[in-house]
């Protein structure tokens, strides 16, 4: 941005730097969206990781099992770690997206202003956020995987189910004690392989869909919810098998998985051979129910928070960045 535009962006709003306001907007959006779909996220993880107690029980049956054995709070098991992860993750993700977008425009002023720019900036931002917050995602999965109390397995008698970790800190300490730093980042490779296309496609489809909405309706909540829903749906469908691989790698120590020590794509092939290709899409229907409101709520809350915190729009940012580039490259008039 030029000096005047930068100063206006930095000082407008509640007296906070622009980057901090972007972090706040992203963090709030992530926390609200994640909590709204926590029960579906819990069941999806149990399906992905093939808990015997939930195999073939379906969505409603799984809800009943969780409620019977763990009560209402069982639907939110692991959500503390999930929110603890998603708030910094979403904050970094959205802020990094805005920053990378500005850097690309500044570094390549001739680049086309459109969804392709959002695809590139979103992909890099997603990778940045994953690397910074992955340990909390691992903890969230391990806490959600364990089931408290006795559960019924088919026609067999109820049996106690293991509860290895007592909470977030206990989980982190146990993982580090048993496997060191490597254990804390187990399964990050498929996360990165998945997040680069998913994050990029999510921003790409969102901005692409918004570009087809009439200008007078573009800032409405309904339009944002609709565009966000389609963006999340398409992005998740394309990258979902890698999410299944990641979950199974994360809980392999608890489930005696044959994936121990194997790479991402080797694990992908093994799951398809041993568990069937359908397992690569296990929980996808639940994920559709989760992703549609989650991404829609996330984008809507983020855009609304940007308005409340007076964060410049992407169009205003692009104009300011290009103005700065022109001012820096303008020839100095001769005296």
Curated annotation (Swiss-Prot):
Write down the superkingdom of origin. Answer: Eukaryota
Q: One GO MF term, please?
A: coenzyme A transmembrane transporter activity
Highest classification ranks of the organism: Eukaryota, Viridiplantae, Streptophyta, Embryophyta, Tracheophyta
Disulfide bonds listed in the record: none
Keyword annotations for this protein, in alphabetical order, are: Membrane, Mitochondrion, Mitochondrion inner membrane, Repeat, Transmembrane, Transmembrane helix, Transport
Gene symbol here is: COAC2
Q: In which tissues is it expressed?
A: Expressed throughout the plant.
What role is this protein assigned? Required for the accumulation of coenzyme A in the mitochondrial matrix.
| GO biological-process terms attached to the record | mitochondrial coenzyme A transmembrane transport
Where is this gene product found? Mitochondrion inner membrane
Under the heading SUPFAM superfamilies, the entry gives: Mitochondrial carrier
Q: What is this protein called?
A: Mitochondrial carrier protein CoAc2
Family, as annotated:
Belongs to the mitochondrial carrier (TC 2.A.29) family.
- Predominant localisation class: mitochondrion
